[in-house]
Design a protein with these regions (language model features):
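Non-catalytic carbohydrate-binding regions of carbohydrate-active enzymes
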Residues: 130, 281-295
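Short sequence/structural elements of tandem HEAT/ARM alpha-solenoid repeats
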Residues: 109-113, 228, 292
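Well-ordered alpha-helical scaffold segments within catalytic/enzyme domains
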Residues: 24-29, 72-86, 90-105, 141-159, ...
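Carbohydrate-binding/catalytic loop surfaces
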Residues: 55-65, 127-133, 137-149, 185-206, ...
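Low-complexity, Ser/Thr/Pro/Gly-enriched N-terminal "stalk/linker" regions
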Residues: 20-129, 159-192
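Fungal secretory targeting signals
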Residues: 1-26
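Aromatic- and glycine-enriched pocket-lining scaffold segments that form the walls
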Residues: 165-236
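Alpha-helical junction/boundary sensor with strong preference for TPR arrays
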Residues: 50-54, 85, 122, 153, ...
Length: 295
């Protein structure tokens, strides 16, 4: 169901407004056309940074100095972005939701091209050409993009390519196999490959993004297994103290210290993925209660 409230899209727009579009933008939050016009201006400014659709460039990549995951973030709306690098993290950040709320299909083909090109041989957003930078959080950003495409009924991938839900499930299934009970009592490491810097670090964004995907898959499919993983991952993060009793979210901890000595730097995107996942879990539980009541 397409959300009719322009205030929902205004939240998306306010996130985009942090991208630093050139010049002042007039915005009336009580006027749908004003919101869409402002969003269009910012979307154009953001997409001007993207070169993956040009001859000789790679779809789904941003030019230096941006990382692969940042392009994945461009494809999915995240409620917040990392405050120090706002202009970097979410430049493509609402292209699926931009289409969903405005009906503007101008960037749909570019979005589709990028999403499909980066799927990887195992259809789980682990392309071989990204092994030097591919962490669990990086992969999860693309998984969240695929899940957003499923949730918003974005155009299906070309024939022969799995659907968006299947691709998001591929990311989830791959990451459940990486759950590491041998160190820190559980959790995902930051990096997948031991040769990458950060392999011995368990960070909040990797585990938070996994929680986000699990919670949203639970809501989308009604499958309790996803909900169980969402609960398990959140409980682990909370048990380590990465989320404090007053919901302050730290960045992560090293396995050498059993994840007890943490980097307490607080990035807003860490909190953001948990907020979105928590909302999905709230709706999932509410739906279960409703269905039980109907029976």
């Amino acid at each position: 169901m397409r959300l009719s409230s322009h205030y929902a899209f205004a939240v998306t727009l306010c996130t985009l407004a942090g991208q630093g579009a050139n010049g002042a933008i007039t915005l009336d939050l009580n006027d749908d056309n004003s919101i869409k016009s402002a969003a269009s201006t910012i979307a154009f400014d953001m997409m001007s940074e993207y070169t993956g659709n040009r001859t000789g460039d790679t779809p789904g990549n941003l030019p230096d100095p941006y990382y692969w995951w940042e392009c994945g973030a461009m494809l999915v709306y995240l409620s917040t972005c990392r405050s120090q690098t706002v202009a970097d993290n979410d430049r493509f950040g609402t292209m699926i939701n931009y289409w969903y709320y405005t009906g503007d299909t101008s960037y749909n083909d570019v979005t589709m091209q990028a999403m499909v090109h980066q799927i990887g041989a195992d259809q789980d957003y682990m392309p071989e050409n990204q092994t030097k930078t591919l962490g669990n959080d990086d992969q999860a950003f693309w998984g969240m993009a695929a899940l957003t495409a499923a949730e918003t009924n974005f155009a299906a991938p070309p024939v022969g390519i799995p659907g968006w839900l299947s691709l998001a499930q591929g990311v989830f299934n791959e990451q459940t196999r990486r759950w590491d009970n041998l160190t820190c009592g559980g959790g995902l490491r930051w990096q997948k490959f031991f040769s990458n810097v950060g392999y011995n670090y368990k960070n909040t964004i990797s585990n938070g993004a996994f929680f986000n995907i699990a919670a949203r898959l639970a809501l989308y499919t009604g499958n309790q297994t996803y909900a169980d993983w969402a609960i398990k991952s959140y409980d682990w993060v909370e048990a380590t103290g990465m989320i404090s009793g007053d919901y302050r979210v730290s960045d992560g901890g090293h396995i050498e210290d059993n994840c007890t000595k943490q980097d307490t730097t607080r990035w807003t995107y860490n909190a953001g993925v948990f907020m979105m996942g928590a909302a999905a879990m709230y709706n999932f539980v509410s739906l279960l209660i409703f269905n039980c009541g109907q029976r």
